[in-house]
Curated annotation (Swiss-Prot):
Protein name as annotated: Cyclic AMP-dependent transcription factor ATF-1
Basic and acidic residues bias (residue ranges): 67-83
Basic motif, as annotated region: 213-237
PTM field: Phosphorylated at Ser-196 by HIPK2 in response to genotoxic stress. This phosphorylation promotes transcription repression of FTH1 and other antioxidant detoxification genes. The CDK3-mediated phosphorylation at Ser-63 promotes its transactivation and transcriptional activities. Phosphorylated at Ser-63 by RPS6KA4 and RPS6KA5 in response to mitogenic or stress stimuli.
Pfam family membership, one: pKID
Recorded family membership: Belongs to the bZIP family. ATF subfamily.
Subcellular location: Nucleus
Record SMART domains: BRLZ
PTM annotation (Phosphoserine): residues: 63, 196
Cross-link (Glycyl lysine isopeptide (Lys-Gly) (interchain with G-Cter in SUMO2)): 206
GO terms for biological process, alphabetical: cAMP/PKA signal transduction; inhibition of non-skeletal tissue mineralization; positive regulation of DNA replication; positive regulation of neuron projection development; positive regulation of transcription by RNA polymerase II; protein-containing complex assembly; response to cobalt ion; response to purine-containing compound
The organism of origin for this protein: Mus musculus
Length: 269
């Protein structure tokens, strides 16, 4: 009984101390938690502020994607504008002057866009037009016109289409023959090609005239004799030079022989 009474008294004595110590500890814990929360909130506010500053700096600087997007959008807008307004782009037409050629005899030749040839000759009061040659095609499709130079025996140059042949007879007359070709589906584009000059010389007629053959033979003989005389003169000149060289060598040898004889006679004495 006494032991139980002592234990009860000790329990009752210890309870007031525990009640006194409990509120003090809870107050300390509350202060510590409030301090930690304030530090965490301050850290979070600092981190939020720094992230906002970095975001603001990045927002001020334009990104490469934004620049590329703006450029592509401007390009597409320009293409759309060109597609919607095709009347803005107008094609300017230019008139090309007809080319003019001058022959060795002073004659002027102009090629018109419709394929006509205009011949003109210079005079004291300006250029005098002679005639106009028109080249037409019977086919519906426009075929190419090829021109070439033709030179006569007197040195005059003329322009002749490629489908025409100019022949000069022995009497000196010029005759033109046209070569007709059948039109084909695959025709060449219209072009003008200047080829190398073609010399139209009168052919030498082969005759059995003995006088003419004799003159030709004599002319050839004279040329051969002239060449033979020239070669003989060159050969004689070469021989003369060789003789002069040998004479000089002979003189030097004679002088050397004399000196050797003198030396031998002095030694023998």
């Amino acid at each position: 009984m006494e032991d139980s009474h002592k234990s009860n008294t000790t329990e009752t004595a210890s309870q007031p101390g525990s009640t006194v110590a409990g509120p003090h500890v809870s107050q300390i814990v509350h202060q510590v938690s409030s301090l930690s929360e304030s530090e965490e909130s301050q850290d979070s506010s600092d981190s939020i502020g720094s992230s906002q500053k970095a975001h603001g700096i990045l927002a001020r600087r334009p990104s490469y994607r934004k620049i590329l997007k703006d450029l592509s959008s401007e390009d597409t807008r320009g293409r759309k504008g060109e597609g919607e307004n095709p009347s803005i782009s107008a094609i300017t037409s230019m008139s090309v002057p007809a080319p003019i050629y001058q022959t060795s005899s002073g004659q002027y030749i102009a090629i018109a866009p419709n394929g006509a040839l205009q011949l003109a000759s210079p005079s004291t009061d300006g250029v005098q037009a002679l005639q106009t040659l028109t080249m037409t095609n019977s086919s519906s499709t426009q075929q190419g016109t090829i021109l070439q130079y033709a030179q006569t025996s007197d040195g005059q140059q003329i322009l002749v289409p490629s489908n025409q042949v100019v022949v000069q007879t022995a009497s000196g007359d010029m005759q033109t023959y046209q070569i007709r070709t059948t039109p084909s589906a695959t025709s060449l584009p219209q072009t003008v090609v200047m080829t190398s000059p073609v010399t139209l010389a009168s052919q030498t007629t082969k005759t059995d005239d003995p006088q003419l053959r004799r003159e030709i033979r004599l002319m050839k003989n004279r040329e051969a004799a002239r060449e033979c005389r020239r070669k003989k003169k060159e050969y004689v000149k070469c021989l003369e030079n060789r003789v002069a060289v040998l004479e000089n060598q002979n003189k030097t040898l004679i002088e050397e022989l004399k000196t050797l004889k003198d030396l031998y006679s002095h030694k023998s004495v």
